[in-house]
């Protein structure tokens, strides 16, 4: 998860920079809504985590089906969600330039590369473990789910 998000952020930052250099408007589609278990994050935090300059005043997002009624079922909640989305995008755009000038990016990048490396190594060790399949079979309804006639 750490490495995937770090690599995605680096790719978006590179594409944003190249777009600026070449005069090409780059637009990203951020599918970050929904439950945390499916990769989602609270709206404000997900937008704040995007690379500086990657929004440029426009933002497109998805909402997973299970959260649509939760967020938009009544007028008050819907107003709050739209305000949160709009203010988060505005904040990201306004702070992107200022923060890029203030943050010693190379130190952050070096730290994230190290964290990402440790994360990737741990993930690969888990995936390559000879005991992983047995653990998953014993701790989840995997075999029962396979028998369901859906």
Describe each region flagged by the PLM.
Residues 2-12, 24, 32, 43, ...:
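Acidic, glycine-enriched catalytic cores built around paired aspartates
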């Amino acid at each position: 998860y750490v490495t995937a998000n770090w690599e995605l952020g680096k790719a978006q930052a590179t594409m944003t920079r190249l777009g600026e250099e070449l005069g090409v408007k780059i637009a990203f589609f951020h599918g970050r809504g929904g439950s945390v278990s499916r990769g989602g994050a609270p709206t404000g935090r997900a937008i704040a985590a995007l690379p500086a300059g990657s929004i440029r005043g426009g933002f497109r997002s998805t909402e997973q089906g299970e959260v649509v009624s939760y967020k938009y079922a009544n007028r008050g909640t819907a107003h709050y969600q739209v305000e949160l989305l709009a203010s988060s995008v505005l904040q990201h755009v306004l702070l992107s330039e200022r923060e890029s000038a203030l943050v010693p990016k190379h130190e952050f990048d070096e730290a994230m590369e190290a964290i990402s490396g440790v994360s990737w190594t741990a993930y690969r060790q888990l995936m390559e473990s000879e005991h992983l399949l047995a653990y998953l079979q014993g701790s989840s309804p995997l075999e029962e789910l396979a028998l369901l006639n859906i």
